[in-house]
Amino acid sequence: MVVPGNSHGIPRDHAIDLSDRAMDLEAEPGQSSDLKEVQKLHELVKRLEIQNQQLKIKRNPQDNHLSALNCTGVMNSINIQPEKGDLQIMPNLQSQLEQINSEKENIPALRMDAQMQYEKVCSDSKPGHKVEIHCDQDDSCFYSVDGSGRSELEEAISKMSELNSSGENILDETALDEVDVLELGSCSEDEEDCWLYVSPRKVENAEQKPDSPLKWCRQVLDHHSPETEAACRSLIGKLDQGYLSIHSALSSQSSVDSELSTSDDSISMGYKLQDLTDVQVMARLQEESLRQDYASSSASVSRRSSSASLHSLRRGTFSDQEFDTYSLEDEDDCDCSLSFRSSHRYSPSPLSSPRCQSPSAAESRATTSRIRPPRRSIQNHVQERMKYANCEDEMRHSMPNLAKTSLRSLEAVRSSRSLESDLQGPSSRLTRMQQPSTSTPPSKMRYGASNQPALTARQPIKPGVSTSSLLTSRQAIKSSGYNNSSGIRKIQSSPGLNPSGSSAVSRTGNVSSSIKHSTVKSQASMGSTVPKSKMIQPSRRSLPSAKMNSTLGDDSWKDGCY
């Protein structure tokens, strides 16, 4: 038997005690319900702590650390696994129950702490929401949170999640900066099916990319298009036409251009128009000179055609010496070289041209005589007219005052012209010189190129002696040589002069000039009497021709002829 008083002395089996404990737990369902309430309370406290930690993570890290410690301490005290949601019954269940009982005594303190923490959370988010805590008679309590408080908690949680996501985005942006961005436009150009068909718009856009001006100019200059070549040709043609027209206008101005140069070497100098007024003056002078050239050319042609019309014109407004001068000038156009004529036009002749002075003023001036080559026969007057027209056309369409003309070409043209004049036969000249002169013109004074007076006795030539005397004079001319050292034709003075009274003509160097002038007078006058003591009017080329045909052996013509 077992004595009840001795029950404490008998050791009890531990397994029996555990079974008894289990039976006691089953017998006490109220205690299990209390444990469930405590578990719910701890879970709620855990959630509140977590939310409080998330809300105050930036404000007060120390409080967060303390709350985390408190939460972990509570969790460790009851050994709750929230994911499982139940209590783990340990072998020392009795000790656990003792701890639970001790914790029941601390429930009001925990309740107050939880209430204070929750009020802090609610005051931080939005004040005015209260939390009701219901406690049972067994000191088991639970929280009943109204709907508004729950919504505020959810909003706070969502804000925290957004902040966390924004922080992650900031970190991600730093990482995205290092990533190469793909250009969708370039990817679309390299499509897989672009080899099959290419849109013409893409080709046009690719061709319309602007190039640099240097590349464009290089491309245009290297590869001429037909339109560009045609435009260049038309532009060059227009420029050539304007060039020739300007040069023809300037070549016809002998009286103005003669004052712009100083010597024969000034052929390399150019005349440049400085102002618009110069152009207008040049145009007016060109107009006047063209009119005078036309009048002189028409007068010389009509004089060659018939002596009667010439004789009738002489009695008009023009004087005999003017027509003689014009005719001699027109003949000299064919004999003189092109370069010499250009040098004549640009050589200084102070008021010696018939365009620049009146006949009355020219008669009173002491001028120089011109030495002319012998006139050609009358049968060749048609050929002379053609050559005269060709020479005039060349002069109208050439600009003699260009720097392009060289002295070498000048000398070549002079030598060719001199040879051409030498090849003229004496027979054609003799037939022209054999016509007797019916008039008896008195002797006239002529001045040479060096302002030295030379007597030329113009006496009547008898028919019987004319052939022999003229033949001897022709032989004297042919016996004289030519000196081309300076490019200018000079007739050497003949050593033997014939100072006869009636059959010979006295010469001091002007042999060819006197013969030609006498034959011109004898042909043209046809019985008319020339006025006495009248000085021969010089032509516009009198001074350069005197230079060209000077018969003096020395260079005295360089000392100044004017």
From Swiss-Prot:
Q: Which InterPro entries match?
A: Slain
The organism's place on the tree of life at top rank: Eukaryota
- Keyword vocabulary terms for this entry: Coiled coil
Using the chain's own numbering, where are the disulfide bonds?
Answer: none
**Low complexity bias spans:** 295-311, 345-355
Q: Does the keyword Coiled coil apply?
A: yes
An example GO CC term for this entry is: microtubule plus-end
Residue ranges of the region described as Disordered: 292-313, 344-381, 409-562
- Signal sequence coordinates: none
| Polar residues composition-biased segments | 356-370, 424-442, 465-531, 539-553
What biological processes does GO assign it?
Answer: cytoplasmic microtubule organization; microtubule nucleation; positive regulation of microtubule polymerization
The similarity annotation says: Belongs to the SLAIN motif-containing family.
What name goes with this protein? SLAIN motif-containing protein-like
